[in-house]
Structure formats: structure tokens, C-alpha cells
């Protein structure tokens, strides 16, 4: 759920004036691997790759270097060798999965009302991504203390996010059912992106382990009845689908997400590719509700190969 203005002042003051430029710069940097001269040796490319790696992470709203991972027994919030770290540790697929999650989340009228009433995503389009990335980093790779602090901060913010949706129903970010929706939409998209565009195959039992590990975070935020297996996730979506539908607020937010803020033709091409990759992993029933065609042949022949190549190039660039 979004954060109210009072809770975002320190963060937003640092980036509100240049958010559009940062997103454009990110698009330029993301396409850099395709433009790098292949004739250069690995040693000659190393300094360039290190600079691009730091710049890409800053432009995406995450720290210039990956977070320090808590490894000592009893210290990490989530298991060091677990599936959450494996999925969340692959930034290229997480970028695609994050966009897919935002698109999917627009279909819940109460969640969307909270975004429309309390978020400044139009003025600071990268702000929510940055805050989400910091939260995911702290809860996935941080210590118990770091994760607990991040969770308590979010819970405090949620206490102030409440209101009434256009249909007259009241909403609150602390509502356990809304928290479950946001969580399931998010982690299912992260996993779908990892399976489609990630560096390695994920087994069925590993899917369940991923949902079990991330459910700990959701319950810590106040969510209830959190799915812990792929079967439970699919059953959850089947149960909640009657509550999901499109509306003016959802359409406005989705248009913003699909359009982006890229200016130059090359930047737009890159962003269109990311959008196409994200839409390819949005469930078909959700795309039908959004009125966005889901041609599997085009996805399989054009979108998926491009996205895999793109993620592979970015993964090479970001490798320490």
C-alpha cells in the first residue's frame, strides 16, 4: 500500500525534482549492454561494467551496491540459502516482476483507491519502486533487527492510509485481506518473472519453499490466510477474482505504467520491451479484465526471447 506524504518527506525531497530524468537515465543504462562494443576484452570492459552497475542500481532506486547479506546462524530474517534470496537476488527479473505486480494490483478497487488517494506516483514515479526495493532488500537479505525495523516502519505508515473508495466502501492499508492481496500479487509476479526470465530453472518444490519463506514477511505486516504453496496461490486467485475489476482509477494508473516517461526513441524501445515482458507474465484472466490481449504466440516468439536476452545482458552488467 502507498505511504502518506508526511511519511515520505525525507525520501521524496531527494528525488522529486529529478524523478523523470532518473527513469530516463535508467532506460539508457539498461540498454547499454546491447551497445557495448563486443570486440573489447573482459578486462577492458570491467571498469565500464562497474560504473554501469552502480548507475543502474541508483537509477532504479536501489543502493549503488547490493545490500550486505546477513549470514550468521540465527541472525538473518530469512534463510541465507533460501528461495527468497535466490528469486529476489536477480535484479533483472525483479524489475520485470515488479512492473507486472503493479499492473496486477490495479485490479483491486480498494487497493487502487488507496494508491489514488495517498500516492504521488505521477510526480515521483520511481519513489514507490525505491521504497519497495529497500523493504524487499531489508526483509530478504537483512538481519532480524533490520527486517523488524523495516516492517514496523511500514506498519506505522499503514495506520495513516485509510479512506473511502469511489464505490463508497471504506479501505485501510492495515486491512489483513488487502495486505494479503498486495503480497500475493507481488510475490507471484516475482516468481513468474524468475521462472520465465531468471538464470536457472525453478522446481515445483522450490516454488512452494519461496511462498513459505515470503509468507513470514506478509504475516509480520499483519496479513492473514497467506498462501504458502503454488496450489494455494492459484486457489486464492480463484477465490478473489469476483472482487477484482477495472475502473477509472485503475485505468489511469495502468496507462501511466504502460506509457512510462521515456523520451527518446531508443529509451521508448527499451521500456516497451520491459512492459511487454511484464505483460507476458500477468495472468491471462487479469489481462482479459484489463482489456489487454494476451496472444501466446507473439509472447513466445517475440517477447520472451527479447526479455531473456535483455535480462541476460543486464545480469552480466550487474555481476560484481
Where are these regions (language model features)?
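Mature, function-bearing regions of proteins
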Residues: 2-181, 185-320
Amino acid at each position: 500500500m502507498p505511504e502518506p506524504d508526511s511519511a515520505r518527506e525525507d525520501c521524496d525531497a531527494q528525488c522529486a525534482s529529478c524523478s523523470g530524468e532518473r527513469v530516463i537515465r535508467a532506460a539508457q543504462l539498461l540498454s547499454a549492454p546491447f551497445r557495448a562494443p563486443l570486440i573489447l576484452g573482459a578486462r577492458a570492459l570491467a571498469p565500464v561494467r562497474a560504473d554501469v552497475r552502480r548507475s543502474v542500481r541508483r537509477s532504479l532506486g536501489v543502493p549503488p551496491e547490493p545490500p550486505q547479506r546477513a549470514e550468521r546462524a540465527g541472525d538473518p530474517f530469512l534463510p541465507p540459502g533460501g528461495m527468497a534470496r535466490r528469486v529476489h537476488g536477480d535484479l533483472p527479473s525483479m524489475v520485470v516482476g515488479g512492473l507486472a505486480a503493479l499492473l496486477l494490483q490495479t485490479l483491486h478497487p480498494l487497493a487502487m483507491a488507496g494508491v489514488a488517494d495517498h500516492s504521488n506516483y505521477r510526480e515521483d514515479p520511481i519513489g514507490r519502486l525505491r521504497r519497495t526495493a529497500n523493504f524487499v532488500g531489508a526483509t530478504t537479505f537483512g538481519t532480524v533487527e533490520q527486517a523488524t525495523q523495516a516492517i514496523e516502519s511500514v506498519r506505522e505508515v499503514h495506520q495513516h492510509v485509510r479512506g473511502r473508495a469511489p464505490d463508497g466502501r471504506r479501505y485501510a492499508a492495515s486491512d489483513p485481506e488487502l495486505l494479503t492481496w498486495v503480497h500475493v500479487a507481488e510475490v507471484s509476479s516475482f516468481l513468474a518473472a524468475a521462472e520465465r526470465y531468471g538464470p536457472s530453472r525453478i522446481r515445483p518444490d522450490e516454488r512452494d519453499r519461496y511462498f513459505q519463506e515470503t509468507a513470514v514477511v506478509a504475516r509480520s505486516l499483519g496479513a492473514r490466510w497467506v498462501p504458502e504453496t503454488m496450489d494455494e496461490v492459484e486457489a486464492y486467485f480463484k477465490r478473489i477474482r469476483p472482487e477484482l475489476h477495472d475502473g477509472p482509477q485503475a485505468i489511469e494508473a495502468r496507462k501511466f505504467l504502460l506509457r512510462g516517461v521515456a523520451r527518446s526513441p531508443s529509451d521508448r524501445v527499451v521500456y516497451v520491451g520491459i512492459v511487454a515482458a511484464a505483460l507476458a507474465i500477468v495472468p491471462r484472466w487479469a489481462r482479459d479484465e484489463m482489456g489487454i490481449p494476451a496472444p501466446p504466440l507473439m509472447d513466445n516468439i517475440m517477447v520472451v526471447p527479447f526479455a531473456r536476452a535483455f535480462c541476460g545482458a543486464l545480469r552480466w552488467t550487474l555481476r560484481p
